[in-house]
Amino acid sequence: MSAGWRTLLLRIGDRCPEYGGSADHKEHIETCYGVLCREYEHSKDAMFEFLLQCADQLPHKIPFFGVLIGLINLENEDFSKGIVDTTHANLQDALHNENRDRIRILLRFLCGLMCSKVVLPNSIIETFEALLSSAATILDEETGNPSWQPRADFYVYCILASLPWGGSELFEQVPDEFERVLVGIQSYISIRRHFDDIAFSVFETDEGNSPNKKDFIEDLWERIQVLSRNGWKVKSVPKPHLSFEAQLVAGVSHRFSPISCPPPTISQSSSEIVKGQEKHEADLKYPQRLRRLHIFPTNKAENMQPVDRFVVEECILDVLLFFNGCRKECAFYLVSLPVPFRYEYLMAETIFSQLLLLPNPPFRPIYYTLVIIDLCKALPGAFPSVVVGAVHALFDRISNMDMECRTRLILWFSHHLSNFQFIWPWQEWAYVKDLPKWAPQRVFVQEVLEREIRLSYFDKIKQSIEDAVELEELLPPKAGPNFRYHSDEGKESTDGHRLSKELVAMVRGRKTQGDIISWVDEKIIPVNGAKFALDVVSQTLLDIGSKSFTHLITVLERYGQIISKLCPNEEMQLLLMDEVSAYWKNSTQMIAIAIDRMMGYRLLSNLAIVKWVFSPANVDQFHVSDRPWEILRNAVSKTYNRIFDLRKEIQTLRKGLQAAKEASEKAARELEEAKSIIEIVDGQPVPSENPGRLRRLQARADKAKEGEVTTEESLEAKEALLARGLEESKELLRLLFKSFVEVLTERLPPISADGDVPNLRAGDPNVNSSARDPEATTMEIDNENGGDNDSQLNGQNKKISHNVGELEQWCLCTLGYLKSFSRQYATEIWSHIAMLDQEIFVGNIHPLIRKAAFSGLCRPTSEGSHL
């Protein structure tokens, strides 16, 4: 075999040239083991490390690696004992460093080693019981901290997740002890708090509050119980050890030492706010790995058992995790999982579940975009049609989709189409033109087309929908500037045209910013006022920078001080944004870019941007366009990115300051030591060191001290900037929530006399009442127990009417974005929650506002200003 042992280890279990195209797992293991034996004496240390690395980063192949280690164990017990001991050290380290993925995978690896007779089954039981004991302690009010239930849930999840990989062997070899573990899990399930993840649901529905809906742990426990009743038979987990059982049984099984879990974090206060902050911190450290999104009917699952679905999901997530950044390898492993059934539909559901995972996907959305593209190319006869079906299914439910997920879906879909020549059966969606302008399906198509134009050009996208000419109405205007002082309009005689020409001439003449500011102060403001001056200057500079992004940035860099001088307060900054919006009225992209760049150059404050977004003209667009929300997202994101960057810089400077102090002290010490060495010359003590060396030491000490002072000054400056940034962020949150509350309070329907909260989704009976389709079907909301979906999800052309009134749709969209911002910036909000409770969430605030804001924080709506 020409392939090296490393390649054979990596490709084991795959149908590949290294194994002659064979898919026989037994043959793979024999071939690989033979090569390992030949190379053992020369490469045993490298094999040791590489086997551990493979098990860590190719966890879906752990059964194969376990058998190889088991076979080596027959010849060299020390090698396998070292594997076991190193695994124990790695698991102990992962527990104390809260490395979630490593804990989960190492427990699976232990099960793989146990199946191959390398680890004693009783040791696995002891490990499980240690984790269960820690989980139960965390939930104890006196000795633990129930706010940290996510950590306890994670420990139990790790146990449950490893059982498909070793439950059968534990049941056969240590049945009584294994039953004790299962009883302990049942006991834990009975005392834990049910987790209602409505804040993280992709779809907004009333069913999300159903007490019968299982959370992720309850669902996984049910799957394991079904597996137990079926005799622990799992089709999705390879069992290569069974082919070598007669050999492996002769090996010596090693004991896995007991583990210790980190003690629970004790709560420092009984305050509900502190408990909420602790729970939020726990959720961040131990997030739920997957929230299932059932897109397709269950008959697409190839008769997959509940636990098989879970195992394949885990394998898909592992590949996505470890091959992030290696897209080709990622696609290869995704399509070649060692399972005996087709799983394209499940793979699509899992990837879309990650893309739409709230509050954030594990990786940047572009990663999932590239993975889907590569899978379409790797499986051209199967996966593209699966993606089409998924898009149609999600589109059918777009009206109930979370606003953040809707935005991600728009961005993904437009990018995906750009890689396939923008080909899509648009005629199937042509009916959306006849829906109200606020209908979510119509807005979705409109926003996708707008994003496509950003990625291409107007005429190309117009051509792509030629089979659905009705949709041309949804295309944005052809992008181009709207210069108020254009010379072709025949209005050159006006003051604005004349002054604009003068300004252009000054820019072309390379006049300095000071010269132009003086010209504005002398020629425009005294005669026409500051607002007119801002109008002329901003329109003209925007026109000069309109050729490209680079031109715009150059103009802002060179002449930003002129705009800054004209916009000393928020009132003038609001006018500046009006000018930007007027100039680029035909280009949402350029408005967003210009405002974002102006904020970057501090020509616009984040508070001014929030006020502008919540101005009447923009508020009226909340439900029909993403334009105001994109600008608001950019402003809030940039604010917190600055703070994040400053914290990183401060952390680096603190390390640098410590190093500078040590260097300064060392240089000073060397200088003093040199000076202290004296000798007697003519009866007088004089330094014995060479004067030249003393001068060098003095210079080095001075330079080191100077470096220390410089670093300390830089640190103080950055800390001052951070303090200012934190204060600005506090004001931003105050204004943001105040603005949401004000506009929503004005428009939300009042509570009834009986105290009933209005149902916004009931809709206006006068909207599309004659066009409603009683046969219209929708996809079931994602439920953890894998219930059947009622809808037909093969991408048929189904006309779905919209029966929600415009006011109700506006309220739904705005409440959705309030929830989205609360969820996205929950960490920052929790640090200022007392202020928000006292100033914003007070009085008779509408319960729908409180629900949206608090659900984003995973905070009970009963909490608030009384705390």
From Swiss-Prot:
Gene3D superfamilies: 1.25.40.180. This is Nuclear cap-binding protein subunit 1. Residues 788-797 have a biased composition (Polar residues). It holds the Pfam family MIF4G_like_2. Belongs to the NCBP1 family. GO terms for biological process: 7-methylguanosine mRNA capping; abscisic acid-activated signaling pathway involved in stomatal movement; alternative mRNA splicing, via spliceosome; defense response to virus; long-day photoperiodism, flowering; mRNA export from nucleus; nuclear-transcribed mRNA catabolic process, nonsense-mediated decay; primary miRNA processing. Signal peptide: none annotated. Residues 9-228 form the MIF4G domain. It is found in: Nucleus; Cytoplasm. Component of the nuclear cap-binding complex (CBC), a heterodimer composed of ABH1/CBP80 and CBP20 that interacts with m7GpppG-capped RNA. GO terms for molecular function: mRNA binding; RNA cap binding. SUPFAM superfamilies: ARM repeat. Keywords: Cytoplasm, mRNA capping, mRNA processing, mRNA splicing, Nucleus, RNA-mediated gene silencing. One of its GO terms (cellular component) is nuclear cap binding complex.
